[in-house]
Amino acid sequence: MNLQILFEEQTKLLNKINLEKKRYLYEKINWNLKSIGILGQRGLGKTTMMLQYIKENFSQTNNALYISLDNPYMQSLSLFEFAKEFEQLGGEVLFVDEVHKYENWSTHIKNIYDALTLRVVFSGSSILQISQQNSDLSRRSIIYTLENLSFREYLELCDIYKFDSFCLEDILKNHQSIATDITKHIKPLMHFKEYLQ
């Protein structure tokens, strides 16, 4: 296996990654856990979040590696053996994207968890396929779900305005003052039409 090629591909991806704008889930993930799953629909930013974490924490080292299992090269390898070799070469964290495209992926993740000290962060967009895997990851992995972009998050990511988030109870109690504050800063209906497109 030629890790150098994979690190070169990772460097190209990291060069395109912006660290200034992050999805809400980024700060909620405990990145120090041994096994983390990030689930969500396609195009929500799972890959970007993983690459942001690598860029922010490992950009000057080869201790973290991003791989995508929709890569034909990765399809031809044993994920467990790949992870084992990466760990032997000093790897600390393996980021595995598109896990649902790899047959028996959950067995490999389970074996990595049980046999190696390597941490693994995996993501996938086919929640149905992921939930149908038969290996018991529930005791080994913490699963986070990346939801669709909220209107509040859209406003922040587009640099329109950054509003605090509120729980439902606060909204029900203080809806008038919250609405008044919002309309002081933006015209919500104008931006909401853009958000829906």
PLM-predicted stretches and their roles:
Residues 38:
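Hydrophobic anchor at the beta1->P-loop junction of P-loop NTPases
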Residues 61-93:
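Short glycine-rich substrate-engagement loop in P-loop NTPases that contacts/grips substrate
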Residues 87-105:
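Conserved P-loop NTPase "ATPase switch" module shared by AAA+ and STAND
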Residues 119-125:
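Structural recognition of the conserved hydrophobic beta-strand(s) that form the central parallel beta-sheet
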